Amino acid sequence: MNLNIVARGAGLWLAMLAGGAVMAQDQSPAQVSGNVGILWQSYAEDTLIGAVVPPSKTGYNAFANVLYNQGDFSAGLRYESYLNSVLGFPGRFDGSGVGYRFARYADRDRGIDVTIGNFYDQFGNGLVLRAYEERNLGIDNALDGFRLVLTPKDGLRLKFIYGKQRFDFRDGLINGPGVVRAVDAEADLNTLVPAWADKPTKVTLGASFVSKFQPGTSFNVDSLVLAMPQNIGSWSYRVNAVRKGWIASAEYAGKINDPSADNGYTYRNGEAFLATLGYSKKGLGVLLTAKMVDNMSFRSDRDLRLFDLPINYIPAVTQQHTYNLAATLYPYATVITGETSASAEVFYTIPKGSKLGGKYGTKLSASFSAANSLDTTRYAEGTREQVLFGYERNSWGP
């Protein structure tokens, strides 16, 4: 009975909110905008590399976004078409239909932001949650559900998320089986604490908790009966500080046992740590980054791999190449099951008007990055420890 009362109260509140929003919109002009993208490819056989022409002989990807805005209210959808999808995209994408739709009400004066439908979001550096799209790579793990963002006072922001992730497309959006539930809090201490308002050092703190639910069963390994956990939790704490030309940040993330295809269905807990230190002034910039990862694969479907249904994101600490040759010669991707890595980058601009700077100035950059596997000891094959945990980590070093 109490739940029904709460639900009715929430429904009444939303109805009043929507009514107030409509009244407020009466004085605001409506705006409709959008964009269209089409990618068509024709294929020819290349015997030198063994490329075989697909039966369709062509690939076709297209999308169109339509957005409606009026005051604090916005809504939109994305119509997509894959007939057939171009090579390099998930081959299971097929047909035409709506792949993304949402409605949003955001009132900054009241400190409330409500979204239903699809949305993208990220907590901190993404170590526990990042929903994003990289259309050119065929990556889209948009959340589909409900998001509430509250700003109860200046300097404090709360996020609540509940939904499923985009997984497939067959004449329309298909979500994965797992349910994602998340909460995030971020505090700007210089705004919240009056005594810190004029301090030269600006500090922001944040904390997140993300869990997933996926039905699971038990299975036998040797003499052990192992049950798949249905509820998996992860959490993170972060800090960011800025003082004049200096910036420093750190984030730690943890995850309870999460057997999956990525880790060989072991019950080992996961950890990740990311830290950056940077300095900049006119014409000069320095950035140092360190990252440590141990078993931090986190998906809303434990049986999938590669780019399918990732909840979190572990960034690579190497330079993002501008030119394809360097990226081809030195490819790198984060090893989410375990690695220790670090990078250093220096940027310098030779002043314009100087002999080397020329008319517009000359920009120089140098970078170094290294990644190593963790220092681990694998448990003896066939032992209980090996089945459950796989290995023991001796240190974060190589």
Feature-to-residue mapping (PLM):
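Well-ordered mid-protein domain cores that form the structural environment of catalytic cofactors
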Residues: 101-103, 110-127, 131, 135-152
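Signal peptide processing junction and immediate N-terminal pro/mature segment
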Residues: 22-24
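Short secondary-structure capping/turn segments at boundaries of alpha-helices and beta-strands
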Residues: 62-65, 101-102
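Short, compositionally biased strand/turn segments
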Residues: 97-99
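Signature for the C-terminal beta-barrel architecture of outer-membrane proteins
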Residues: 26-59, 68-69, 74-75, 79, ...
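Bacterial N-terminal signal peptides
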Residues: 9-20
